[in-house]
Swiss-Prot record:
The record marks 331 as: Important for catalytic activity. It comes from Halobacterium salinarum (strain ATCC 700922 / JCM 11081 / NRC-1). There are 2 substrate-binding sites: the catalytic A site, and the non-catalytic B site that may play a role in the transfer of substrate or product between the active site and the solvent. Alternatively, the B site may bind allosteric effectors. GO terms for cellular component: cytoplasm. Belongs to the class-II fumarase/aspartase family. Fumarase subfamily. It is found in: Cytoplasm. This is Fumarate hydratase class II. The gene is fumC. Substrate binds at residues 99-101, 129-132, 139-141, 187, 319, 324-326. Homotetramer. The active site is at 188 (proton donor/acceptor), 318.
Amino acid sequence: MSEDYRTEQDSLGEMQVPADAYWGAQTQRAIENFPISGIAFGRRFVRALGVVKKAAAQANRDLGLVDDERADAIVAAADEVIAGEHDDQFPVDVFQTGSGTSSNMNANEVIANRAAELLGEEIGDRVVHPNDHVNYGQSSNDVIPTAMHVASLDALVNDVKPGLETLAAELDDKADAFDGVVKTGRTHLQDATPVRLGQEFGGYRTQVEKGIDRIEAVAPRLSELALGGTAVGTGLNTHPEFPETAAGYISEETGVTFREADNHFEAQAAHDAMNEAHGALRTVAGSLNKIANDLRLLASGPRNGLGEIEQPENQPGSSIMPGKINPVVAEAVNQVHKQVVGNDAAIAAGAAEGQIDLNLYKPVLAHNFLQSADMLANASAAFGEKFVAKLEANEAACEAQVERSMALATALNPTIGYDKASEVAKAALKEGKTVTEVVVEKGYLSEAEAADVLDPEGMTHRGILSGDDT
């Protein structure tokens, strides 16, 4: 940034602003007031601010509230913000005033000065005024929650859902590929009745698909926009047709359907929709964590673990142990889950706060939500493409472990009864024999009957196995 400065003014007086900056006095005050985290809003939220300001200018132009020349210049400047041409002009820390006023004014000042420049005027001369023109009929109290919903729903629809769909597709492929592989089921991390590896992967696929359903279910609440409520939800200083008109332009710009909030007081004083939607993200993160942990266990080894699946060699696993390969992508998914849980705690706390007519945790809600969405979108796609897609079944290990399993005795219950089946299982464990060997030795079943009743593949289907051929 240039060492030269220009003088900008707001209602509190003059401020020195870098000469090549599009922001003005209020943004500069925020920069100086909030040296908190060094974290500014990212691309998605800045884009959403541009979308809101563009739609507001279009609506105000249509309603005859801002003249065509200025409105068109604001629209052009906002288009540049939407395209990411001015991301470096949004330096305000996410930890700021709870209404997000600093970020709203940051957008107003950048767009006003760039619009003036497009009109052939000088930056800072206020021919396009940040409040009177760019922010006409708006308040930070309705702009920021509107941008929150626009950015959040955009993230869910265009990134999180496709990422999860990628993962679900890879899991579905493995469910088909592994459907003929019979393995030992496990409950309480102890041997249980047989299951097909494909059935387990089908369960994982369904978990992810239900996660997509949960995300889609919260979309209607996020599609409601606070814009038009102005300061406290009454709509003071805004045209009666402004909210609906602006929402139409936002829908057109994003390709996602948005509408005016059912109740502007609720839309500004509470952020239950953000809390609910992030709850869906937290649930999805938990599902991915469970799947990642299961796959890590199934791939444990390669010689002294379960070893039922073979993991991809994504990268060397150890700086000291040659040849070691770790489930690094699955571990990354585990860590994303922990961060999402932390973000959820912040969002739940922030959504429960705010006094009377305004929730004052808007920036931290937006930041944490969008971070979770970005991480889950990226983690889902990477998990599917770089880990799940490259998994292979270790059929020999699966078969060997099934043959040794004491849980096969469960299938004996309908034929010889629970007590005798327990006797067989205990004897097999004590004597180091298979269940089949013991049940035949004790004379409870013939070899042919045992082969029918103790068929591992048959146990993976609903029904009662019997040694009776009739």
